[in-house]
């Protein structure tokens, strides 16, 4: 998960809003994957996971009517551990990895500008990738993780719903923020 706050996500949504209003998804592909089981899960314990996203965008200035959003993912699945399961000098992360997976999805988007409208900036494209692009690819990421964990002979993992922060009314205080995926 990332250290971004709800306020950061809302700022990115505002920056990418013009693209979000005009872009349509045309194709989705899994570009690469590498997965490994490091140890069997402990039957008496549940599993927990950590999923990190790294969004990026590829756009050719000569054909700016289309762009590709890539989401690189790093998944770590661990045994849930009690504090007494950790040996001195080890961290829970070092002792509990059951499996890891690195994979990347890409989506092709196209859009149509209105007459006289400027091409999107790199900042708009990057903000779109981190917000709407991530939301567009997330159902495919969820399905892939569910399928992958089953194929690795692990209990199928259903990822949590990806949430979007709520806008705050003008003059209202920001609620306590937490990191979002």
UniProtKB/Swiss-Prot annotation:
Chaperone is among the record's keywords: yes
In-chain residues carrying the UniProt-annotated modification N-acetylthreonine: 2
One GO term describing the cellular component: peptidoglycan-based cell wall
The keyword Chaperone is annotated on this UniProt entry: yes
Official protein name in the record: SecB-like chaperone Rv1957
Subunit-level organization: Homotetramer, interacts with antitoxin HigA1.
The entry's keywords: Acetylation, Chaperone
InterPro entries: SecB-like_sf
Family, per entry: Belongs to the SecB-like family.
Induction: Probably induced by the DNA damaging agent mitomycin C. Part of the Rv1954A-higB1-higA1-Rv1957 operon, as well as the higB1-higA1-Rv1957 operon, which is probably the mitomycin-induced operon; the former but not latter operon is autorepressed by HigA1.
Gene: secBL
Gene disruption phenotype: Disruption results in slow growth. A triple higB1-higA1-Rv1957 disruption mutant has no visible phenotype.
Known function: Chaperone component of an atypical, type II toxin-antitoxin chaperone (TAC) system. Prevents antitoxin HigA1 aggregation in vitro at a 1:3 chaperone:antitoxin ratio, probably also protects antitoxin HigA1 from protease. Required for neutralization of toxin HigB1 upon ectopic expression in Mycobacterium marinum or E.coli. When expressed in E.coli complements a secB deletion, restores export of OmpA and MBP and inhibits aggregation of proOmpC although it is less efficient than endogenous SecB. Complements the general chaperone function of E.coli SecB less well.
